């Protein structure tokens, strides 16, 4: 018989640097799982992606066991790295925070494709372009 799911928790944590301190401890503590076991497993799985923020989905079962599903970094994080900027524009349509090329946009879209609700790479590019626009990042040819 399959294990009964008691909860699903979504977190965005720095790769390889998760600690039992907030936000991890309070989010998972209520389900009674071993927080140190989660932190150790997450850090092992994400050690190669240091410097990125990696979203994780923790499925918690009734026997207090859990499974970890890693996602791709947020589109905004990937776009900031591609544009080489610290943060997006406070006024996106007025002030340009940075620029990326169409090739860089395609690379970000390909990386995010598995997490996006898009059927083709062109549709994924449009989604990522919208995120870039709302951050004040201009796309140049």
UniProtKB/Swiss-Prot annotation:
Any single GO BP term: translation
SMART domains associated with the record: RL11
Bilayer-crossing regions: none
Database matches in InterPro entries: Ribosomal_uL11, Ribosomal_uL11_bac-typ, Ribosomal_uL11_C, Ribosomal_uL11_C_sf, Ribosomal_uL11_CS, Ribosomal_uL11_N, Ribosomal_uL11_N_sf
Cysteine pairs bridged by disulfides in the record: none
Post-translational modification: One or more lysine residues are methylated.
Cellular component, GO annotation: cytosolic large ribosomal subunit
PROSITE patterns to which the protein is assigned, alphabetical: RIBOSOMAL_L11 (PS00359)
GO molecular function per UniProt: large ribosomal subunit rRNA binding; structural constituent of ribosome
Keywords in alphabetical order: Methylation, Ribonucleoprotein, Ribosomal protein, RNA-binding, rRNA-binding
Pfam families with a match to the protein in the record: Ribosomal_L11 (PF00298), Ribosomal_L11_N (PF03946)
Function of the molecule: Forms part of the ribosomal stalk which helps the ribosome interact with GTP-bound translation factors.
Family, similarity comment: Belongs to the universal ribosomal protein uL11 family.
NCBIfam families tied to this protein: L11_bact
Matches recorded under HAMAP family: Ribosomal_uL11
Quaternary structure (record): Part of the ribosomal stalk of the 50S ribosomal subunit. Interacts with L10 and the large rRNA to form the base of the stalk. L10 forms an elongated spine to which L12 dimers bind in a sequential fashion forming a multimeric L10(L12)X complex.
Protein name listed in UniProt: Large ribosomal subunit protein uL11
Gene name of the encoded protein: rplK
